[in-house]
A protein has these predicted regions:
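Active-site beta->alpha loop and helix N-cap motifs at the rims of alpha/beta catalytic domains
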Residues: 1-108
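Catalytic alpha/beta core domains of metabolic enzymes, predominantly
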Residues: 91-92, 104-174
Length: 174
């Protein structure tokens, strides 16, 4: 029996394009079915800034209302790197950008309060979905940002408490 050999792995461009096209089809179906009754947000987070920008371009063409961009996963960027990542994304789209902090899905990476405060001054970054499950962190985002910046809960169990403390709403998984 031959042992597997190590070698470079090339991403399959056709499969990636197919996946992007399928995402766009899903967004279009959701937009069609909701008939503008509710805003439609597209989750466009990816490993690279370039990939997020490409997905945002597709989301913009389809006509979604905003994009939600999770922090990059599998890597541990610094706050400066995350700042440049999110600013490049926000600068490259006309769509409102919602930051998405979900440490449980990104190897423990949490957007710091200082970083969110700094990013909240960008005219195209309109809010953050906080799925940390840490109400203290959510409250820190609320206290550190202006009233027009939407801090949204991502944990169902914290919606009520978050709203009491000033969160603007929730984007739930259920």
């Amino acid at each position: 029996r031959d042992a597997p050999r190590a070698g470079p792995v090339q991403p399959e461009v056709r499969e990636r394009l197919k996946a992007l096209t399928e995402r766009a089809k899903v967004w279009a179906i959701v937009l069609n079915e909701t008939t503008e009754r509710v805003p439609v947000y597209a989750g466009t987070g990816a490993l690279t800034t370039r990939s997020v920008i490409q997905m945002n371009e597709m989301a913009e063409r389809v006509g979604v209302d905003a994009v939600s961009v999770i922090t990059p996963y599998f890597i541990s960027p610094t706050d400066d790197e995350l700042y440049r990542h999110y600013v490049a994304i926000a600068d490259a789209t006309a769509l409102p950008v919602i930051l998405y902090s979900n440490p449980g899905r990104t190897g423990g990476l949490q957007l710091s309060t200082d970083l969110v405060t700094k990013l909240s001054s960008h005219e195209n970054i309109v809010g953050i979905k906080d799925s940390s499950g840490d109400l203290t962190q959510t409250m820190a985002y609320i206290e550190a940002t202006e009233k027009d910046f939407a801090v949204l809960l991502g944990r169902d169990t914290l919606i009520y408490a978050g709203l009491i403390h000033g969160a603007k709403g929730a984007i739930t998984a259920t």
